[in-house]
Amino acid sequence: MLYRKKNPHGGAAYEAGVLLDLSANTNPLGTPPAVLDAVRSALDRVRDYPDPYCRELVAAIAAHEGVSPDRILCGNGAAELIYAYAEAARPKTAAETAPTFSEYSEGLARQGCRVERYPLREENGFLPDEGILAFLEEKRPEAVFLCTPNNPTGRLFPPALMDRVIALCRELGSRLFVDECFLDLSEGGVSLRSRLEEWPGLFLLKAFTKSYGMAGLRLGYCLTADGDLLERMSACSQPWNVSVPAQAAGIAALGQKEFLDRARAVIREEKPRLKAGLEELGCRVCPSDANYLLFRGPVELGEKLLRRGIALRSCANYHGLGPGWYRTAVRTREENERLLAAMKSAGEE
């Protein structure tokens, strides 16, 4: 028997018959060759335990982010760090937007935390608005979870509004968790890492998964000036949680700025074409600042595409969405055209 949690996301590539997995929002160019070379070289060391402190990787991240090494904790993917944060911080109440990434509330629920949700409006393009400030003042949560660009909507959190949220969280004594995992592949996104030293309540989540096409290696990290929190999070994680190949891959990936630049150029060119193609097929496509698009189509679309070997991310289980909502990664011209051709064929059934 196979054991897995309800409504899993990721891993569609392993389902029978899937030839094109658009459910995972990874780099459209795949994995940098230098990263693959680093993984191959690391195989000679797999008989040894990995460094439990990820010292070389942490030093590389510190140089890349311009922060002190003691502000960094690495994990077995961003998801592990979400769960470790929830266990270490143990807020009794939390707030998030809806829709957003489900692992925040999953991790919080395991700690008995009550989660309040601020609804993002479709008529506003799912863009966060000033109403979230009054919502937070009313709910006064112990922790606030935000995602920029948001998953699945692809919208960046407006910088001026983020400044006000930070100020309000400091005033309320609320921790602020900001997921920046898709920021590297977005247009115009600016990290909050320069704000870390202002306030230890700020926590940033990062991942190699999306930016460098490394979902199968599981590698993420977080940044915060709250050293006590990082120590508790580390205690919540299993030892040797980042493998030898993953650590080597992370170090190599951080030197791939040109690869990221090329990926962003592909996304910049292909996203408008894909959006227009989806709209021509009668879908309602939401604005996006990220490397993926949220759209509404026929309820049966997902199943019809699976029969044609293509997997989308069904967003039916997201708070604030429902059946007929889908998310697709923006990929290469050829892959995007395969999707559109399959959708046209499905519509003719």
What are these regions (language model features)?
Residues 1-48, 140:
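N-terminal "arm"/small-domain region of PLP-dependent enzymes with the aminotransferase-like
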Residues 30-32, 53, 201-286:
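PLP-dependent aminotransferase class I/II
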Residues 54-94:
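Phosphate-binding glycine-rich loop
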Residues 87-146:
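PLP-dependent aminotransferase-like
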Residues 117-119, 143-150, 176-180, 286-287:
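Short beta-strands and strand-loop turn motifs
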Residues 126-140, 152-211:
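Active-site pre-lysine segment of PLP-dependent enzymes
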Residues 160, 307-308, 317-349:
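PLP-dependent enzyme catalytic core of the Aspartate aminotransferase-like
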Residues 268, 278-309:
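Conserved PLP-binding catalytic core of the aspartate aminotransferase-like
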